[in-house]
Amino acid sequence: MRLILLGGPGAGKGTQANYIKEKYGIPQISTGDMLRAQIKAGTELGMKAKAIMDAGGLVSDDIIIGMVKARLQEADCKNGYLFDGFPRTIPQAEAMKAAGVPIDYVVEIDVADEEIIKRMSGRRVHVASGRTYHVVFNPPKVAGKDDVTGEDLIQRDDDQEETVKKRLDVYHAQTEPLVKYYGDWAARGEAGAPKYVKISGVGKVEQIRDSIFAALG
């Protein structure tokens, strides 16, 4: 099972990725983790990436694809792999295709912007313990206070409505075109084209999980 998981910030990709990894016995491929591992190992690609990052630059798609190909040769990828957060752009998707990285399914978890804003901007955190709440879905017993200590809860900067809206803007501009790219490729039915599956990300996490599993077969 070789797949790409797409969806906006707050769509629930992380939760569903864990279910998929467990069911199919496949690793989640994170480009951030790969970069750190290659730099730590002192590989040629890792050193190139480190030099670029140290200079404040963005690591090129060529280097990332090289790391992806190396990562997929490792033993834990024998049953497949799950990409979450990569590719982010059409050029990255094209580079993966050109490099012959096989993909069986592209799964999009679809959640409307208004729902994502409600989910993320309603989160509250107790900093010392890491306990999380939600003003609508999982409220504390006393508004704004941690259930255990009674201490104040905070809203993280990442969860503020303006920040969430900016992240959604970036997603729509950069990553959402991938939905069309993979949908069109799947529709053409070319050899090597992945199957494209759109799943509603609204509802209980178990229902969403079961919908994904049913689609993957």
Swiss-Prot record:
Which GO terms of the molecular function aspect are on file? adenylate kinase activity; ATP binding
Q: Does the keyword ATP-binding apply?
A: yes
* GO CC terms, sorted: cytoplasm
Instruction: Summarize where ATP binds, as residue positions.
Output: G10, A11, G12, K13, G14, T15, R123, T132, Y133, G203
| Gene Ontology biological process terms, A to Z | AMP salvage
The segment annotated NMP runs over 30-59
Query: Which of this chain's residues are annotated to bind AMP?
Result: T31, R36, G57, L58, V59, G85, F86, P87, R88, Q92, R156, R167
Pathway(s): Purine metabolism; AMP biosynthesis via salvage pathway; AMP from ADP: step 1/1
Family classification: Belongs to the adenylate kinase family.
PANTHER family assigned? NUCLEOTIDE KINASE
What is the name of this protein? Answer: Adenylate kinase
The species this protein belongs to is Thiobacillus denitrificans (strain ATCC 25259 / T1)
Q: Which gene encodes it?
A: adk
